[in-house]
């Protein structure tokens, strides 16, 4: 019985050397060092930081942490940064590619939560949802909750799966899924989060959501989407659908 338990735990063991973490960053000198240190403490050594035209010391701090740094001369937006980072990670042929926000809102321990469905349950993509845990949901400001639900619905209407947190920055892709999605990716800005889900459905990829925790700070709350960004996402998704 003990031998069987040991064998099962070995089968479900995550080899973190086969995982690449992509961290898009724009003017993140305040948090990028801590974010990278925390990821490395959890055993994630293969990290790609995409400095999306920052005007501060984001690149210098990331380089000191010994990670791969790709730098855009001009700011291209979240979609542009993620596209560059995923393409870079694909060159190393990892089993799993993770996207992870630079602003400190994600727990590095939650990376395993999105990895497991892809590695062990036959899913092609997993999203860490801030909306599945009722306690976490209470911590999210009402405006963000309403905006998130609206964008979830829009993502579904535009041809994607209906998910609880379409705008989450914590995701896992299998190598094959990332290759399929990156070949069709058009978004340069925040609409990329919805486009990932739309393309997942287009390619018939199996997607799972898992609950994650979020670290809400004054700093992390100042980043990400707002009402104006939400309308921009809607407009760009409609344009992509038409053209």
UniProtKB/Swiss-Prot annotation:
Gene3D superfamilies: Spore Coat Polysaccharide Biosynthesis Protein SpsA, Chain A. One of its GO terms (biological process) is protein N-linked glycosylation. SUPFAM superfamilies: Nucleotide-diphospho-sugar transferases. It holds the Pfam family Glycos_transf_2. InterPro entries: Glyco_trans_2-like (IPR001173), Nucleotide-diphossugar_trans (IPR029044). This is Uncharacterized protein MJ1222.
